[in-house]
């Protein structure tokens, strides 16, 4: 066998071992197509913002927090976030370029970026809060999304998953839609502790009633911070 033959066979083996790129997420096209008319129902937009104002205390955002809004869409609630956490910073991300283009038109005091939270991410920044509003069911790989969100949170940072509908009504609504979102569901309540735990997050509270789904989880503090109270007690 010639050296050339050996080289070609080695190249073929390496080629076979190379992983195939993941297929594009069809949800991107789904939301891109709907972006221009997403906020046409002005009454629905007003109702959404009014409901968020009512829930502000329960959501728990406070001035000065740096917030990552995941699945910001057209920026429907981004302005509300900016006002709620001012002088904190809001970075709003989405995987739909067309949705982000609509959001940019609003000229809000927020930074809009493209991000696929289910893909490979470089966690160069960390935030006090990651908020997923009307977004989590559309994450094609929910366990991976949670792992990525954990990396994007500071130690002690909070994940908030919020829907202005309970999981039963939301899942029923999605099941009546066409592909690719007809199977986009919120997990059952009993599944959340393990799902979050595998991502390195701890469930703090879960409200799932008619008209509201509100989950809060926390990124555990660093070991040094956990041990600090015991060390202080020992010194006393």
Where are these regions (language model features)?
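A conserved beta-strand element that flanks and buttresses the S-adenosyl-L-methionine
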Residues: 131
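Class I SAM-dependent methyltransferase SAM/SAH-binding core
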Residues: 68, 74-119
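Short alpha-helix
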Residues: 184-199
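A short glycine-rich, Lys/Arg-flanked "PGG" loop and its adjoining helix->strand segment in the class I
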Residues: 143-155
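Short catalytic micro-motifs in class I SAM-dependent methyltransferases
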Residues: 134-135
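Conserved class I S-adenosyl-L-methionine
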Residues: 2-60, 76, 80, 99-102, 160-186, ...
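Core SAM-dependent methyltransferase catalytic element
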Residues: 205-236
């Amino acid at each position: 066998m010639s050296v050339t033959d050996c080289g070609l066979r080695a190249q073929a083996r390496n080629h076979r071992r190379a992983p195939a790129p993941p297929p594009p997420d069809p949800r991107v096209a789904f939301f891109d197509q709907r972006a221009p008319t997403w906020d046409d129902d002005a009454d629905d937009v007003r109702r959404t913002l009014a409901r968020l104002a009512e829930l502000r205390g329960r959501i728990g955002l406070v001035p000065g927090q740096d917030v990552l809004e995941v699945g910001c869409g057209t920026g429907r609630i981004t302005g509300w976030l900016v006002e709620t956490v001012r002088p904190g910073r809001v970075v709003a991300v989405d995987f739909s370029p067309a949705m982000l283009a609509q959001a940019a038109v609003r000229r809000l005091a927020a930074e809009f970026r493209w991000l696929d939270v289910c893909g490979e991410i470089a966690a160069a920044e960390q935030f006090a809060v990651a908020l997923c509003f009307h977004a989590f069911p559309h994450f094609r790989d929910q366990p991976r999304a949670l792992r990525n969100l954990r990396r994007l949170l500071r130690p002690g940072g909070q994940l908030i998953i919020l829907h202005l509908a309970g999981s039963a009504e939301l899942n029923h609504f999605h099941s009546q839609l066409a592909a690719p979102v007809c199977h986009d569901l919120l997990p059952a309540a009993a599944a959340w502790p393990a799902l979050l735990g595998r991502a390195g997050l701890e469930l703090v509270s879960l409200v799932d009633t008619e008209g509201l789904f509100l989950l809060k989880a926390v990124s555990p503090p660093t070991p040094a911070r956990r041990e600090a109270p015991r060390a202080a007690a020992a010194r006393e």
